[in-house]
Amino acid sequence: MITALDHIAIAVPDLERAVARFLEDFGLQHDGNEVVDAAKTTTAFFSVPPTHIELVHPLDGGGPIATYLEKRGGGLHHLCFRTDDIDADVARLREKGYQFTSDAPTPGAHGSRVIFIHPKSCDGVLIELSQPAEAHS
């Protein structure tokens, strides 16, 4: 079951500049960066209780974030909902006709399992479902 808005992700062409903006200009708490190999990104995390903001930047100029930046130059990339049973939610949504960008959940940040719902199924918005690892629930 979906339990919360987990985060809002913003694709950024310059990660250092974006991190500085969120730290210095907006005064947000920077929780660190993590390379997410499965997504081909470096992600910077900011706490904005009760949710988070993630700044996503492509690794080595490849992957879906690089494609997004080439087309749009940065901006809101996706919304992520936290779930306590990603497999059940995927099955339930598939039964309702939702399309996903992959066949099954993949590894996400902090040991989570994630899957994206295709924007065509959600009025043009890319939606991520994320089941946190036990340590981060």
Residue ranges and their predicted role:
Residues 4-6, 28-40, 60-77, 92, ...:
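A cross-kingdom feature marking solvent-exposed beta-strand/loop segments within repeated
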Residues 36-52:
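C-terminal "cap" of GNAT-fold acetyltransferases
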Residues 1-19, 74-83, 133-137:
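N-terminal beta-strand motif that seeds the catalytic metal site of vicinal oxygen chelate
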Residues 11-41:
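N-terminal first-folded block
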Residues 50-53, 60-62, 86:
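Short, charged/polar surface micro-motifs in flexible loops or helix N-caps
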Residues 5, 12, 22, 46, ...:
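Short, structured motif recognition centered on aromatic/hydrophobic residues
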Residues 19-20, 66, 87-91:
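Alpha-helical elements of the RecA-like P-loop NTPase motor core of helicases
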Residues 44-45, 81, 90-137:
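Vicinal oxygen chelate
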